[in-house]
């Protein structure tokens, strides 16, 4: 009987950096080299060591799932997909539209060793994953899916661009969008009065986050690290990701890249017009759009069809 199962592992989640702070480490903090947007101190290296140790524990949990599939005699018939839901769990990673927050690991294991060792350098988005899973099952993705399959029978054309947005995160209202091609990332800040850093209460449990805030208030952070806490100096940002992987140098005013700015700005505006029409709405305006007059819209109920003994099919247009 075909099966589809999803397992979510929390051990490598942001919150586990402080919740598992006293667990044994598999890497010594002194061996950690923090990225340039983090202060290189004992607190930072310690939290990074916890994060890496959490990933090690997650790897062991993944192995347990694989062993269960093997013991059930299904390993040679099962496609295993593993990926994360955002970039790194550390400050200036999760929730950010930079590479540190949007680049995620993604691995596929086919039962016959197909494509083993292959590295796919094409651009993909999360919306591509459901369509890809259907394609792997030889099912044509429905028209209402925006995703492009990148594996399987219905594999589509490679993307030239990928897009991102952040607006309502935890208890914070923000408004940013981005577009990335094979080399450059363009970011638009719609609330330039806000800094990149957001005071998210749960994240302030992380010792490293507490330390960064304290150092910034004392003027002890270097230019690269403190930039995250300051108001964006520009409404627009452009980064050469290939040559500046941590996206520390904003090229938006460099005339040598004016054509890239114009091209990516146009792509961003076209994407917003098509997929992000409520971008500029206030909370009250958005609520009225979703629930006119404060009334919850009634959606079409699902349809259940009996397809065989002990089998039903549930369909819904919404």
Task: Name the predicted role of every residue range.
Residues 29-78, 113, 136:
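A long, amphipathic alpha-helix that forms part
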Residues 4-8, 58, 62, 69, ...:
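Beta-strand elements within well-structured catalytic alpha/beta cores of enzymes
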């Amino acid at each position: 009987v075909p099966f589809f199962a999803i397992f979510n592992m929390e051990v490598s989640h942001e919150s586990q950096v402080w919740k598992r702070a006293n667990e044994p480490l598999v890497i010594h903090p002194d061996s950690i080299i923090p990225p340039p947007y983090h202060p290189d101190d004992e607190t930072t290296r310690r939290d990074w060591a916890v994060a890496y140790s959490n990933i090690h524990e997650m790897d062991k949990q993944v192995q347990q799932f694989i062993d269960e599939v093997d013991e059930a005699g299904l390993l040679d018939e099962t496609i295993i997909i593993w990926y994360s839901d955002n970039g790194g769990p550390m400050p200036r990673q999760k929730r950010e539209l930079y590479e540190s927050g949007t680049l995620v690991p993604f691995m596929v294991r086919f039962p016959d060793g197909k494509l083993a060792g292959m590295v796919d350098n094409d651009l993909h988005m999360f919306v591509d994953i459901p369509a890809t899973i259907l394609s792997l099952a030889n099912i044509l993705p429905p028209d209402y899916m925006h995703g492009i399959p990148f594996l399987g029978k219905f594999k589509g054309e490679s993307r030239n661009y990928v897009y991102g947005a952040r607006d309502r995160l935890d208890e914070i209202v923000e408004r940013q969008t981005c577009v990335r091609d094979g080399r450059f990332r363009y970011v638009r800040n719609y609330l330039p009065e806000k800094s990149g850093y957001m005071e998210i209460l749960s994240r302030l449990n992380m010792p490293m986050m507490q330390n960064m805030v304290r150092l910034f208030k004392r003027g002890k952070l270097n230019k690269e690290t403190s930039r995250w806490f300051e108001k964006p100096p520009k409404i627009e940002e452009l980064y050469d990701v290939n040559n500046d992987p941590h996206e520390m140098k904003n090229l938006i005013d460099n005339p040598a890249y004016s054509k890239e700015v114009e091209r990516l700005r146009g792509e961003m505006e076209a994407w917003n017009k098509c997929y992000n029409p409520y971008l500029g709405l206030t909370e009250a305006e958005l609520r009225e759009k979703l629930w006119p007059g404060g009334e919850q819209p009634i959606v079409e109920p699902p349809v259940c069809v009996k397809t065989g003994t002990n089998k039903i099919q549930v369909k819904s247009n919404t």
